[in-house]
Every structure is written in C-alpha cells, then in structure tokens.
UniProtKB/Swiss-Prot annotation:
Organism: Schizosaccharomyces pombe (strain 972 / ATCC 24843)
A GO term from the CC aspect: cytosol
Gene Ontology process terms (BP): glucose metabolic process; purine ribonucleoside salvage
Catalytic activity annotation: alpha-D-ribose 1-phosphate = D-ribose 5-phosphate
Pfam family, one: PGM_PMM_I
Annotated protein name in UniProt: Probable phosphoribomutase
Active site (catalytic residues): S149
Cofactor binding remark: Binds 1 Mg(2+) ion per subunit.
GO MF: magnesium ion binding; phosphoglucomutase activity; phosphopentomutase activity
Length: 587
C-alpha cells in the first residue's frame, strides 16, 4: 500500500465508528484490493450546490455515516458563521426511503442538536418538496433532505436548502466545503439523540402538512385550476418511492379519490427498486408496468412521480400506442394551461412569468412572445430557477411556472423547488378540461406547435468513469478551429453563436461576455446553429460521471424539426466525441 493511501486508511480507522464500514475497509485490506481501496478513499466526496451524492459504502469518497456527520458539522459551522441567530432559527431535516436514509437523517439531526440548533425532524418519509416548504414556512436557517432522488439503488445523497427555501447557489457551496474540511472529527454518533433532546421538534409535521395542503388548494382555486368535473380514470405509479400517500392526499383534497388506479408492484417504498433498471421516469422501461396496468383497465393516461416525488412524468395512449411526453413537452403544456387560466380570471398578463433553463425547449420562449407574457432563462438546475423566482416574487410578479427539461416543475411558488405532487394535480386538472372538449394532450400539443412552432428536443448523454476525460473532450472544442477556436460548423449546419459559461464567452453579446453566471467548476457550452434553427448545449454533470447534451431543433413541420435534431445528434458523435474511440458509453 502506498504511503498516501495508508495515511487515508489510518485516518478512516481513527474517525469511523460504524462497524459495517470499518469492516468493509478491513476486508479490502485483507484481500489486498488496493485499487478499490484507493477509489473509495480519494478524492473526498465533493460538496457542491447539490450537496452530496454518491454510492453508499465505506470511504471518504462515498456516502456513509462518517461523511454525513462531517458534512453536517461543516454545514452547521458555516450557518453559525454566516446567518445571524442561525441556531435559534433552526434547521429542518427530512429523509426518503433509501438505504441508510433514516440513519443519515438521525445523525444529521444529532450534529445540529449538539451544535445547539433548534431541529425540526420529520419522523416519517417525506417527498423532497416538503423540506424547502418547511424552511420557508417555519423561517429556519436551512434544511437538509436525505435523498438521491432518481439515482440507482446504490446511491444516496444530502441535499441542502438555504433559509430562503431555495437550493443553495455559489458561493455557499465553497464556504460549506471549506468548513467541512475544518470539522472532520465527529462530535457525536448518537442516532437516538433526536428522540428526547429539548431542542428537537418531531411534532411539527402534522401542522405543516395541513398548511401545505391548504396553500395548494388555495392556489389552485384562486387560479381556476380546480373546478369540479366528471371522473377521469388514470394510472399512477410512484416507482417504488414515497409519492403514493402524498398523491392520494392531493386527490382527496380535490375530491378525486376514486379516479386513480395504482401499480401494486410499485406502490410501496422499496429502496431496491426491484421492477426497474433505473428508478427514473425519463428512462426507457420505467413506466412499463404502469402501461400494462392501464392496458388491462382500458385507461389512456399514465402519471408518475420519481422516487422522492419531486419530478413528474406523463404518458398518453394514442391510436393503440403509448407516447411518453418529454420534460420539455410537459413543461410547455403546463405553461400554456396555467397562462390560459390566469388570463381567463382577468389577471394582468404583464405580471405573468414563466421560467426555464438554458437547456430547455425554445417553444416556451416563442409562446411568451406570441402571448405577451414574460419568459426568463436561467442556468440549469432548480437552485437558479428558485432563486430567480424569489427575486421576481419580491417585485410583485406572478410565477406561473418554472421548469427544467428533466421532469422538474414548480407550479406557482408555494415551494421554491420542483414539486411532482403539485405538478401532477395541475396536469390532472388540465386533462379534465380537455376531456370536456373531447381533446387529447397529443392534439393540444399539435395545436400549440402550429401556433408557436414545431420544436423537437433530443437529449442524451455519454457515460465515462474517467471524469477528467469528459472535461478534456469539451475543452478540445475550445481549440477546435485555429482561427476562432470553437467549431464553425456541425454537420451541414453553420454555427452562428457560441456561449461558454465556463470561460464567460458569448459571441452574441457586444462585449463578448456572457450575462448569465459563469462557473469554472463544470463545463457548459451552448451552440446556436443557423441563427436559432438548432440550439444545442453540452455540459458535464455535477452529480454523475456524464457528458450531457441537449438539442432543441425548430422546423416547418414535426418531421422537419426531428430531421434537424437527428442530424445534429449524429454529427456530435461522428465529428466531435467519437464514443467508441474514447470509451464512452451511450444509454
């Protein structure tokens, strides 16, 4: 064993008191599996704007009791340094059903209690949006949700919210990371401290949930979403997650309890997600059991939430075949419905805002131009959408929708983060409207396309365990052409603009500088082809070893837009990234 690895192992045994993870390391040493040992020990799991996310297991690079305690100590210390009366304001802590989630949540609570924080602890499983809602409602200094959302079963995570109810943005991530490095020695391992500590509140959840449902009902009623209508049957699946009781409560709230048929094999929380390869409704196969249930009952609609119920997915059966709508399509449909209802109740159009990210469909931008409402674009991630929504809210603006293409939707601003339950109930109201008009979602989307333009999005990724290679491949595009640096063409199409949010370059601005926030910690480059006929963004993932690309193509017809998107997708592979040559896996 090399000296650096030996030092890390010694440090691990000095700090870790969990017999399971101590034994994992001991077994690797006994087997002389130094390659795996090095992989789990270094580099330390990074704390970013998404908090922590990694596979569960021993080592400083993994999610385990020690790294959760260390993260909590650093976060608590950072709050004490930066937020006046942070301990008195307190923190909210919630968790989902994943392996070790309850243990990690209890250890997080123990650390904050030891640091003197009032600690609001959800005793039961919650869907992720309840934590930022609680932070906002209770006025706490921060919140922590233990979840890995829709990642595979081997993963868990530690998601952090600031006192404004939004996910954290820079520079908080770096500040917290620095405090973690200075607070590595555990101050407690007592998982039961939250049971009887005087600063622990485990009874707040009942009142908080009543408040959540009350605000949800009020928002939908005020904006004319929730008129009573005839029954509409649909199939719902939580994909082995926590969503079912929350969706059921939402249906009861609006008098719809008899309309839903569930998927028995996927109803209950199961951290192993046994019926799906990936518990992500974006992935092929994730909704197959729901389709089977719908087919068996003669139902044309499937609605789903991801395991922590912050994302929402929809599929419709048309002409005997299932169509799973993309996140962009659902986002545009929701924006259209919410705006129409807002307009119908006579509210001022100039106050209506829809927010989306740089990698979302351009259709919503076209819709805003045609209809006269405001559209604002942010960087990728709800941390940016939530904070921008809050900024506009303070100006008295109405946030109709904020969305990102990865099935994340914030309807209104009850929660300043994506909420799959609120999105689902909103979409259900839309379906009931269309039922009265004898229209399908597919038909409505065709009407929208004729009015706002035919747009096709094709999003995918390359997977590699060699993260530096992914960054190097993107960096090579900055030196692709000897004259301008960036490529001048892709396939048969001319590249007319480039925006690089890693370097801060934007060819479309007068001074060549980007107006959106710049970050050197990850890659984010947008190429505009043929003056907006195709907009494509390439970015490295903050939570996964992926190089993601997002293509939005416009055309004179659906077929034309698909053709444009497909040409660009193929050219990315054949001209820029050469997957086989570079050892990149495709989904």
């Amino acid at each position: 064993m090399d000296p650096i690895l030996q030092e890390l192992v010694d440090e691990w045994f000095k700090l870790d008191q969990d017999e399971t993870t101590r034994n994992e390391v001991s077994q690797l040493i006994k087997a002389e599996d130094y390659a795996t040992l090095k992989q789990i020990m270094h580099p330390r799991i990074g704390f970013g704007t998404s908090g922590l996310r990694a596979e569960i297991g021993a080592g400083f690079a993994r999610m385990n009791c020690l790294t959760v305690i260390q993260a909590s100590q650093g976060f608590a210390e950072y709050l004490l340094q930066t937020v006046p009366s942070a301990a008195k304001l307190g923190v909210v802590i919630g968790h989902d059903h994943r392996h070790k989630s309850n243990t990690f949540a209890r250890l997080t609570a123990a650390v904050f209690l030891q640091k003197g924080f009032k600690t609001y602890f959800f005793d039961h499983l919650v869907h992720t949006p309840l934590v930022p809602f609680a932070v906002k409602t209770l006025g706490t200094a921060a919140g922590v949700m233990i979840t890995a959302s829709h990642n595979p079963a081997a993963y868990n995570g530690y998601k952090v919210y600031w006192g404004n109810g939004c996910a954290i943005i820079p520079p908080h991530d770096k500040g917290i990371a620095a405090c973690i490095e200075k607070n590595l020695t555990p101050i407690t391992w007592d998982k039961n401290l939250v049971e009887n500590h005087k600063l622990a509140d485990r009874d707040f959840a009942v009142g908080l949930l009543k408040n959540y449902w009350s605000q949800l009902h009020e928002f939908h009623s005020e904006n004319n979403f929730s008129l009573e209508m005839k029954s509409l049957k649909f199939v719902y699946t939580p994909i082995h997650g926590v969503g079912l009781p929350f969706v059921t409560s939402a249906l009861h709230l609006f008098g719809e309890q008899g309309d839903m048929i569930s998927v028995p094999l996927q109803d209950s929380p199961n951290p192993d997600f046994p019926t799906v390869k990936f518990p992500n409704p974006e992935e092929e196969g994730a909704l197959d059991l729901a389709y089977e249930q719908a087919d068996a009952n003669g139902i044309s609609y499937v609605l789903a939430t991801d395991p922590d119920a912050d994302r929402f997915a929809f599929a419709e059966k048309i002409n005997g075949a299932w169509r799973r709508f993309t996140g962009d399509e659902v986002g545009c449909i929701l924006a259209y419905f919410i705006f129409q209802e807002y307009k119908n109740v006579g509210k001022p159009i100039d106050d209506f805002y829809v927010l989306s990210t740089t990698v979302s469909s351009a259709m919503v931008k076209s819709m805003a131009k045609v209809e006269g409402f405001h559209h604002v674009e942010t960087l990728t991630g709800f941390k940016w959408l939530g904070n921008k929504a809050l900024e506009l809210e303070k100006q008295g603006k109405f946030i109709g929708l904020a969305y990102e293409e990865a099935l994340g939707y914030m309807v209104g601003s009850i929660v300043r983060d994506k909420d799959g339950v609120n999105a689902l109930i909103t979409f259900l109201h839309l379906l009931k409207r269309l039922q009265l008009q004898n229209l399908s979602i597919t038909e409505v989307f065709e009407q929208m396309s004729k009015k706002y333009g035919y747009y096709t999005t094709q999003n995918s990724y390359f997977l590699s365990r060699d993260t530096p290679k992914l960054r190097a491949l993107v960096d090579a595009l900055r030196h692709y052409d000897t004259k301008s640096g960036y490529p001048a063409t892709l396939g048969s199409k001319k590249i007319t603009n480039v925006r690089d949010l890693t370097t801060g370059y934007d060819s479309s601005s007068t001074d060549g500088k980007a107006t959106l926030p710049v970050s050197k910690s990850s890659d984010n480059v947008t190429f505009e082809l043929e003056n907006g006929e195709v907009i494509m963004t390439i970015r490295t993932s903050g939570t996964e070893p992926k190089l993601k690309f997002y293509i939005c193509a416009r055309g004179h017809s659906l077929e034309d837009s698909i053709k444009n998107a497909t040409e660009v997708k193929q050219a990315i592979k054949s001209e820029w990234f050469h997957p086989q040559q570079n050892g990149l896996e495709e989904p």
